[in-house]
């Protein structure tokens, strides 16, 4: 079961903003980063650096051991470590909505854009836009209805 910090550690801050709750020792995780997880090509899961700049994902696997036995990957998992959790609202604001990207990759570990070599590939961006639309139109209203304290995007 894969759980890499760059995409699935939900206790990481959403952004590098110093006022943002969450850890930052391993980067930042937002909905976009959780959605970009590629369980069968984890090196290409890191599409942006910690400053939001696009990375050259075509070279990220260079010199690293390739994953050859896909059948050994049985799932993905989000992690929530509790060093900075002081109340249940902290839990829900860390988890929602960024965990939706992890759910999406657990459901579809080989998205259509998996083989792309550019972080800003149009196929990826189109699917990311569809994902955002789904979260905004279905998930956020549910969180509101259930009175779940989720992290709202800052302007």
Model-assigned labels for residue ranges:
Residues 1-155:
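Substrate-binding groove of N-acetylhexosamine-processing glycoside hydrolases
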